[in-house]
Amino acid sequence: MKFALSLIALILLALIVPFFLPGAGKQAGVDPNSNLPWQISVDGQGGSTVFGLQPGVSTLGDVRQKLGNEIEVAIIAEPSEIGLLEGYYAQMPLGFVLAKMVVTVDATNEAISAMRERALKARHMESTTRRITLHPDDLAAADRLPIRAISVIPTVNLDEATIVQRFGEPGERIVVSDKRTHLLYPKQGLDVVVDQDGKELLQYVAPQQFARLREPLLAAPVENSPR
């Protein structure tokens, strides 16, 4: 399965739990004006920094150090697929925005297959998707691997006008269904999925890796909602 589409599907499954009330992200010890989703810096050499992390450079261990040890690390896999190695935060204050977050680890298929063989247990999530718990030795090894992408779903619904106000005008819009549109910001390495029926999804990669997100969207057929 293509990276972008599989990432969206697996993340939406992981983030299906209802969200909290607006303003709940204003927690003690959290600067409400820093680490916000639209505070993205680029280095002019194909890299970017968001939430104090650099996709493609920062490791899973860096994520723990920066955002906390509450992260849950597992392999998320659909039937007949190797799966993705992911870290999941059920609740993460990003400035004044409360969100759920998934970081995708840049692990090879061979490494993930080996981790699956040593895994302690597996359980089903939604449908036939499986969540596979790593052996402690593999958890330690995973901390040394770089993260490929960061995905965030804010607590509140964001319409397109609000997104444009915060992030600016997108470089491109790709409509994938009657209800879902991707707002692409290639210079920032950002894809914002606007969903009229669900929560919005923000996906961050290094700008030099933006084709990982864009190309599968161009190849996918437009889905029409049932009437």
Describe the residue ranges of each PLM region.
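Hydrophobic membrane-insertion alpha-helices, especially the h-region
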Residues: 2-23
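Extended compositionally biased segments used for macromolecular assembly or nucleic-acid engagement
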Residues: 19-20, 42, 53, 91
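Generic structural "secondary-structure junction" signal
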Residues: 40-42, 52-55, 75, 152
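Residue-level signal for functionally critical sites in structured catalytic/ligand-binding pockets
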Residues: 36, 49-55, 62
